[in-house]
Amino acid sequence: MGFLITTLIFVVVGIIASLCVRICCNRGPSTNLLHLTLVITATVCCWMMWAIVYIAQMNPLIVPILSETE
């Protein structure tokens, strides 16, 4: 899977999680804002971690060295 497809998956999961929080934890406007902020922040942090690892594998800093005995 490519970078854009997985990014879209994270966006869809974030939207679904936000809707679930709005439906399941409906206690007032300020609590809803806090819950939505936490869900969006968690989704963005997970996406950033995945993106950094994915991009780091595209251009590794250390090139694998093959031994001649193998």
Swiss-Prot record:
Q: Which InterPro entries match?
A: ATPase_V0-cplx_e1/e2_su
Binding partners and assembly: V-ATPase is a heteromultimeric enzyme composed of a peripheral catalytic V1 complex (components A to H) attached to an integral membrane V0 proton pore complex (components: a, c, c'', d and e).
Q: What does this protein do?
A: Subunit of the integral membrane V0 complex of vacuolar ATPase. V-ATPase is responsible for acidifying a variety of intracellular compartments in eukaryotic cells.
Membrane topology is: Multi-pass membrane protein
Q: What sections of the protein cross the membrane?
A: 1-21, 36-56
Report what the protein is called: V-type proton ATPase subunit e1
Q: What is its main location?
A: Golgi
Record's subcellular location: Golgi apparatus, trans-Golgi network membrane
Q: Which family is this sequence assigned to?
A: Belongs to the V-ATPase e1/e2 subunit family.
Which Pfam families does the protein's record reference?
A: ATP_synt_H
Keywords tagged on the record: Golgi apparatus, Hydrogen ion transport, Ion transport, Membrane, Transmembrane, Transmembrane helix, Transport
Picking any one GO molecular function of the record gives:
proton-transporting ATPase activity, rotational mechanism
Task: Quote a single Gene Ontology cellular component term.
Answer: Golgi apparatus
